């Protein structure tokens, strides 16, 4: 059936999801999303720019439409191809388990553990600030400079230099009746 059912229809009025369903029916097997999009674009005679604009909605429609099923790794099929009981099995346990073994397994590296080669490139985060040692030494030295007896301080001996002339500070503290009237 597939694309033949659209033979008498205006292609501009067809939705991408309808065409994708028909393409999968005609193909009869799983297809990668990119292949589906290319086939839809070719059938509808749409430009690359127009397809790019409609692509997010098309992908959302495929996910939400109950007739499509994602087989993983962006491969899609029609749900009607699978018996209801086997849908979960098919999605969770692909037939090609050998492909999983061929994938590269990367060795995990922990940068915070010492390596077996004994490299000195490992950073000791507990002892990373040389200024910590300087501060500890300065604190020890400064304890001797000060005594608990503050008898050298004379509270009554105020220097005359501490008194400021009555400049702007005096002007700010003085308030005239004329100043109050200007604010109102």
UniProtKB/Swiss-Prot annotation:
UniProt keywords, alphabetically: DNA-directed RNA polymerase, Nucleotidyltransferase, Transcription, Transferase
Location of the HTH HARE-type domain: 14-81
GO MF terms, alphabetically ordered: DNA-directed RNA polymerase activity
Highest rank taxon of the organism: Bacteria
One Pfam family this sequence matches: HARE-HTH
Acidic residues bias locations: 118-164
GO cellular component, one term: DNA-directed RNA polymerase complex
GO biological process: DNA-templated transcription; regulation of DNA-templated transcription
Keyword Transcription in record: yes
Chain residue ranges for the region called Disordered: 88-107, 118-184
Coiled-coil segments: none
Assembly description: RNAP is composed of a core of 2 alpha, a beta and a beta' subunits. The core is associated with a delta subunit and one of several sigma factors.
Role description: Participates in both the initiation and recycling phases of transcription. In the presence of the delta subunit, RNAP displays an increased specificity of transcription, a decreased affinity for nucleic acids, and an increased efficiency of RNA synthesis because of enhanced recycling.
Protein family according to the UniProt entry: Belongs to the RpoE family.
HAMAP family: RNApol_bact_RpoE
Name recorded for this polypeptide: Probable DNA-directed RNA polymerase subunit delta
Annotated organism of origin: Lactobacillus acidophilus (strain ATCC 700396 / NCK56 / N2 / NCFM)
